[in-house]
Amino acid sequence: TKRQAQEIIKENAERCGQYYVNQRWLGGMLTNWKTVHKSITRLVKLNEMFEKGELAGYTKKELQGMKKEQEKLQLELGGIMNMGGQPDLVFVIDTCKEALAIKEAKKLGIPVIGICDTNADPECVDLPVPGNDDAIRAIQFYSEMISASVLDGMQAMIAEKGVKVEEMVEEKA
């Protein structure tokens, strides 16, 4: 993911409760889920270890190595840590840079929405959105629109089931 898009993607994905990858796409993140899930399990185990203070019996060097591993895994997999399996849709900012993610999604039949700049091939994504994938303001705009659409879709789905969003808000209060 482009450096200028990393924080924007994280904020908007968290705002609508969706999973995200805002660092380098790891090969096999979708197509080799078993291996990725093992890494996520390791991350959860390390997080629990450090939170509970179960650090007795480890040397300073071992603890330092585990902390470094935890930070690396958190950076790479933190946005998909609670994802149970394949996503229903993949949204990509730069279709040229994220070609591997698009290829994996296509292989699994997952629809892809992609921002296609003038240097990109719109044929590689299912729903191309023509636009600038470099400018921070443009990235912010696209991310906010997708986030708002997800929230609208969730609200419509909840309303369809007969639950009013206002009632849910009142129950939580």
Model-derived features: where do they sit?
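Intrinsically disordered, compositionally biased charged tails
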Residues: 152-173
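Extended, charged alpha-helical interaction scaffolds
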Residues: 60-92, 96-113, 117
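Short, well-ordered alpha-helical segments in soluble proteins
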Residues: 44-54, 67-70, 74-77, 81-84, ...
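Phosphate- and divalent-cation-binding pockets in alpha/beta enzyme and binding domains
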Residues: 4-8, 100
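Short glycine/threonine-rich loop/turn motifs
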Residues: 101-103, 108-159
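Long, charge-dense
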Residues: 8, 12-66
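Short, ordered loop/turn segments at secondary-structure junctions
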Residues: 1-3, 18, 23-28, 95-97, ...
